[in-house]
């Protein structure tokens, strides 16, 4: 359209109560409460739940706006309105979603990529060559959720999500921690049967870790993996820690292998519990040399006599932020925003 017509149309829209955000020869971007649309273009705004595939390849539904008997979904007919000679119609905005890339970024510092660098650093290749890939092993992770990143699809990794009480949105991992940790698991055991128990979380903290762990136990897995804990340096155990201690012991007595993080500089609990496998961290430099990570914890427990942490080690970065392993996370998640390359 000619500039004069665009300007005249924008002024008419403003006069009718619309906010005009941008003007151009093809379209004018506007916004207003639903009742303004319904008044100017005699119609009703309705909602429709439409099946979609979000960026994580997760089938779900999204709420779209439209009008009854629309010739095209989301099109408001301008005929019969004061704008009938100025615009062809109104196209209602639709929700769009971030699409993650299968290819990781390439930061200009020494780092490891999943799965190959982790597999090599942990020396898992000989096991894979023998056909030991986690097939038939049921692992439950208790964490912030699992986002179906295209990385997992491209490598054939499969997982499912179970919500703990209070957790919502099984297709999302708003924090990103659980999704990233699962990539480490798949690097070592690509054929493992993964279930993620999404615990209710607030920022970087799990709100109901006891309930989430109990949910994991109820699924009767072979292994429960938890990369979290709190700082318990000296006895006595807090009331919370005593409850957690009891349910961890119960899980082990049921024949479940329980793995907990040794901590990131603190005296992690349940990571120091005597019944768990406590996982610490070593740093592998670019020449392949290994050294104890100054980011991961190592200590002798003051609560459980003769208990030294950790029992085993994975690969972990160094202080100050341990930015070391390139992991897939949900775009826009807390980990993506604060730790992204």
Q: Which sequence ranges carry the predicted segments?
A:
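Protease zymogen maturation seam
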Residues: 54-55, 62-135, 237
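Active-site-proximal beta-strand/loop segments in catalytic clefts of secreted hydrolases
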Residues: 23, 31-33, 142-145, 197-202, ...
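Acidic-leg catalytic submotif of subtilisin-like serine proteases
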Residues: 117-167, 260, 312
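Active-site alpha-helical elements of protease catalytic centers
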Residues: 137, 142, 155-156, 163-198, ...
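Substrate-binding/access-modulating region of protease and related hydrolase catalytic domains
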Residues: 180, 199-276, 341
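Loop/turn elements at helix/coil->beta-strand transitions in domains of secreted/extracellular proteins
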Residues: 16-19, 135-139, 158, 190-195, ...
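Inhibitory N-terminal propeptides of secreted protease zymogens
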Residues: 1-94
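Extracellular S/T/G-rich loop segment that most often corresponds to the catalytic His/Ser-adjacent loop
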Residues: 143, 271-341
């Amino acid at each position: 359209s000619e500039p004069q017509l665009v300007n005249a149309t924008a002024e008419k829209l403003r006069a009718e109560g619309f906010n005009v955000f941008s003007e151009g020869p093809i379209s004018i971007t506007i916004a207003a409460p639903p009742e303004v649309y319904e008044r100017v273009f005699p119609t009703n705004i309705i909602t429709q739940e439409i099946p979609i595939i979000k960026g994580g390849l997760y089938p779900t539904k999204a709420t779209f706006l439209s009008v009854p008997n629309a010739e095209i979904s989301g099109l408001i007919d301008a005929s019969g309105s004061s704008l009938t000679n100025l615009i062809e119609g109104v196209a209602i905005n639709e929700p769009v979603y971030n699409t993650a890339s299968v290819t990781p970024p390439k930061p200009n510092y020494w780092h490891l990529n999943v799965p190959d660098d982790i597999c090599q650093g942990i020396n898992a290749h000989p096991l894979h060559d023998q056909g030991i890939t986690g097939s038939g092993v049921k692992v439950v992770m208790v964490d912030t959720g699992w986002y179906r990143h295209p990385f997992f699809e491209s490598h054939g990794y499969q997982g499912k999500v179970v919500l703990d009480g209070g957790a919502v949105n099984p297709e999302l991992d708003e924090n990103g921690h659980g999704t990233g940790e699962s990539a480490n698991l798949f690097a070592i055991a690509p054929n493992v049967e993964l279930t993620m128990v999404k615990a209710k979380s607030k920022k970087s903290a799990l709100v109901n870790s006891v309930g989430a762990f109990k949910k994991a136990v109820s699924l009767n897995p072979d292994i429960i993996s938890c990369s979290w804990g709190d700082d318990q340096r000296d006895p006595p155990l807090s009331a919370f820690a005593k409850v957690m201690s009891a349910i961890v012991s119960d899980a082990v007595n049921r024949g479940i292998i329980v793995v907990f993080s040794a901590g990131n500089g603190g005296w992690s609990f349940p990571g120091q519990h005597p019944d768990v496998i406590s996982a610490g961290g070593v740093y592998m430099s670019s020449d392949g040399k290994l050294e104890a990570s100054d980011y991961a914890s190592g200590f002798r427990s003051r609560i459980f006599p003769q208990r030294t942490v950790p029992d085993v080690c994975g690969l972990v970065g160094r202080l100050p932020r341990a930015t070391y392993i390139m992991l897939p996370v949900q775009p826009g998640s807390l980990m993506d925003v604060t730790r992204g390359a």
